Design a protein with these regions (language model features):
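Short, structured beta-strand/loop micro-motifs enriched in basic residues and often containing a Trp
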Residues: 1-10
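C-terminal binding/interaction regions
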Residues: 26, 134-188
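A broadly conserved detector of short glycine/acidic/proline-rich loop/turn motifs that flank catalytic sites
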Residues: 10, 30, 65-67, 166-170
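Feature captures the catalytic cores and cofactor-binding loops of soluble hydro-lyases/lyases
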Residues: 32-33, 37-160
Length: 188
């Protein structure tokens, strides 16, 4: 487990170099979407339409930020529960998206897709939306404005603190932590 500063895009090579448990400070362009936005994007793909952004090597942050205060780039921007995107994540990875930022566990189907497409799941700290917003230097609404907080946005972040929860080989920090605890403490 390392502490690393990485710059996007999240290429296949960069994704493969990350390991579950790595502390990462992320800099570059990311996109925001939650379940309503993911549903629309997957429906568009099913109709053969283009997405509102190029998904190649993209990282998607599962967030619905609050409105920005006067003079601020964005409001509070904490992660939402990633499981709500599990039905859509394999499709998004199949068209090139590689990174996902959120909180909580992922279904085995998502982990299988991550192994197939060299995806990485980063965990952001829940409840720290105001602090995470300080890492967001630019925010631009790009699609689905009618979804309000769930609209798609393009963000530029600097040194966003994250942890690799699941790496491109399927290693899962949550499972590793449980196994380590049981090894040390047994089934008590």
């Amino acid at each position: 487990m390392e502490r690393r500063h990485i710059t996007l895009p999240l290429t296949k090579e960069l994704a493969r170099s990350l390991h579950a448990g790595d502390q990462v400070y992320l800099t570059g362009t990311i996109y925001t979407s939650r379940d309503a936005g993911h549903k629309r994007m997957c429906e568009a793909l099913a109709r053969g339409e283009q997405l509102p952004f190029d998904p190649t090597d993209a990282t998607i942050y599962y967030v619905g930020p609050t409105p920005a205060k006067p003079g601020a780039v964005i409001g509070s921007a904490g992660p939402t529960t990633s499981g709500r995107m599990d039905a859509y994540a394999p499709t998004m990875m199949s068209v090139g998206a590689r990174g996902m930022i959120g909180k909580g566990a992922r279904l085995p189907e998502v982990v299988d897709a991550m192994k197939k497409y060299d995806g990485v799941y980063f965990g952001a700290i829940g409840g720290a939306g105001a602090l995470l917003a300080k890492c967001i230097k630019k925010a631009e609404l790009i699609a689905y404005e009618d979804l309000g907080a769930e609209a798609l946005r393009k963000l530029y972040v600097e040194d966003m603190p994250l942890v690799v929860i699941i790496d491109s080989e399927g290693n899962n920090l949550y499972e590793m932590g449980k196994a380590e605890y049981l090894k040390e403490h047994g089934d008590k």
